[in-house]
Amino acid sequence: MLKITKICLASSATSTAQRSIALTAPRAIDQKWRAAKGLPENPNAFGPLTNLPDYTYLDGRPTPLGANQKRRLIKQQEIATRIVELSGELEFAKQRHERLKANAESEKQRLIRSKLKPKGHFLLKK
């Protein structure tokens, strides 16, 4: 018995066990079907369950915004202001580029006009 145990221990020490590690997480949602239907990848990111209030008053009073609704609204407002700011900067950069291009062209024309002056008998004809 002791001899068998020693053999088992010796053989287990020399053999190495290989372990595979999965590097990608499995997708629980069929993404191809959702893309074909025009739906977002995450069904909880957008839709009536996330955008509409949880309840309504029967007398028609507006329902207060939920915490996540308020957070999403504030985030969307920040994104909108950032878009307006960046589009203004882009328009300014376009105008500046056109202005610099026109200035460079006029400077080039001025240099050409100053270099090419009539000389000799062409100067006397005027």
From Swiss-Prot:
GO CC, one annotated term: mitochondrial large ribosomal subunit
Q: Which locations, inside or outside the cell, does it occupy? A: Mitochondrion
Top-level taxon in the UniProt lineage: Eukaryota
**Xref: Pfam families:** MRPL52
- Molecular function via GO: structural constituent of ribosome
Q: Which GO terms describe its biological process?
A: mitochondrial translation; translation
Q: Where is the signal peptide?
A: none
Keywords, alphabetical = Mitochondrion, Ribonucleoprotein, Ribosomal protein, Transit peptide
Q: Where is the transit peptide?
A: 1-28
Task: Give the family this protein belongs to, as stated in its UniProt record.
Answer: Belongs to the mitochondrion-specific ribosomal protein mL52 family.
Please describe the quaternary structure of this protein: Component of the mitochondrial ribosome large subunit (39S) which comprises a 16S rRNA and about 50 distinct proteins.
> Would you tell me the protein name for this molecule?
Large ribosomal subunit protein mL52
The root-end lineage is: Eukaryota, Metazoa, Ecdysozoa, Arthropoda, Hexapoda
